[in-house]
């Protein structure tokens, strides 16, 4: 797919096949953006408890963005659930038809997100979804404060 999209070209050395690009990381990133999609399959709101091990708790959405940038968090917390975590918990969750005060948001992701530790020294035990997944989940948001935070987040991507 990477070759078909024009991001890389394939070449062979002996029996091995390799990919190469004459473009730098930034150019590849700019070209690839159009083909990337959000990892969030769907989002639910609930008052029901979701039982996860401490190592599995992962902030998502605006909660994660507020830990990694200067944007303010909402009062309600948002967490990420992998497909497996969702399957394990969904029978015990009463999903609300819409966001309610005091409810918790869960974003069900298409894949298991790599955890990223928050830079906030006061919450060193807080894990967030990886920066790329977070960026993708907000990229078409349209809110100017979110766009500014995404720009800051994008500058920190390590290639």
Predicted feature residues:
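A short, conserved structural fragment
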Residues: 3-14
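A broad, low-amplitude sensor of folded, mature protein cores
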Residues: 1-4, 135
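Long, low-complexity, charge-rich intrinsically disordered regions
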Residues: 30-159
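Basic, amphipathic "hinge/linker" alpha-helix immediately C-terminal to the N-terminal HTH DNA-binding motif
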Residues: 23-28
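Minor-groove-contacting beta-hairpin "wing" of winged helix-turn-helix DNA-binding domains
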Residues: 15-22
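Internal, well-ordered alpha-helical scaffold/interface segments
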Residues: 4, 29-30
């Amino acid at each position: 797919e990477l070759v078909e999209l024009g991001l890389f070209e394939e070449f062979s050395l002996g029996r091995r096949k390799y990919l190469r690009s004459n473009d730098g990381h930034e150019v590849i990133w700019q070209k690839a953006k159009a083909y990337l999609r959000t990892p969030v399959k769907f989002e639910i709101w609930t008052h029901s408890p979701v039982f996860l091990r401490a190592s599995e708790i992962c902030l998502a959405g605006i909660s994660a963005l507020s830990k990694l940038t200067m944007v303010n968090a909402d009062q309600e917390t948002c967490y990420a659930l992998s497909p497996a975590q969702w399957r394990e918990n969904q029978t015990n969750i009463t999903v609300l038809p819409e966001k309610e005060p005091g409810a918790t948001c869960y974003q069900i992701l298409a894949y298991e997100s790599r955890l990223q530790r928050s830079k906030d020294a006061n919450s060193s035990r807080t894990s967030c979804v990886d920066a790329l997944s977070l960026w993708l989940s907000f990229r078409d948001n349209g809110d100017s404060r979110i766009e500014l935070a995404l720009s800051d987040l994008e500058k920190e991507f390590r290639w």
